[in-house]
Amino acid sequence: MKNLNICIDIDGTITDAYYWLNLSNKYFNTNISKEQVTEYSIPNVLGVEESVYAEFYENHKFQIHLEQELLPNARKLINKLSIYNNIYFVTARDKSLTMLTHGYLKKNEIAYDDLYVLGSPDKVETANQLNCDIFIEDSYDNALQLSNAGYKVLLIDTNYNRLPLNDNITRVYNWKEIYKIINKLLLQYEAM
């Protein structure tokens, strides 16, 4: 029997948070640096209309998501966690990216029990269905929503999520720290 139900976002959580920046800069003829990405809304960061970015994204989403780089230690530590825990990837990605996302995880040899491509940023209902014990996320709004619903959230630090946290959210800086926190939680769970 596996112990914890771990829900993990993908973009900016297991992958580099600024994965979209190079292609976006080239397409929109901008020169935005990672340090300038201080909010979650990509169109706002780029200074373009939502509809203009949506058209760009629709035409380039497969390329954008296929080329994402994993964060250091993400693969190794998720695979270690998967031995004794359920790993559920829960992403707001467009549903048209479901097969690509399965392929990406397989290509990168990341172990998981299931993938939920929601097409929406609302993850609370899925966390409820999965009986989530801990959620790993990069979006500040998602972290607040999940934590306000009673979930423990590990928020991966980025330039765009450095806002005040509540008691259910812990800011983390890398996958080694995430692994350590989950192992501590696992020990507490086993002691009960």
Placement of each model-derived feature along the sequence:
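Active-site neighborhood of HAD-like aspartate-dependent phosphohydrolases
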Residues: M1-A54
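Metal-dependent phosphoesterase signature
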Residues: Y40-K76
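Short, acidic loop-to-helix structural element flanking the phosphoryl-transfer center
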Residues: F62-F89, D94-H102
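Hydrophobic/aromatic beta-strand patches that form the interior of the parallel beta-sheet core
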Residues: Y88, Y116, I134-I136, L154, ...
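Substrate-recognition "cap/lid" segment bordering the active-site pocket of phosphatases
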Residues: D94-Q145, A149
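Asp-based, Mg2+/Mn2+-dependent phosphohydrolase catalytic module
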Residues: N128-Q129, Y140-M192
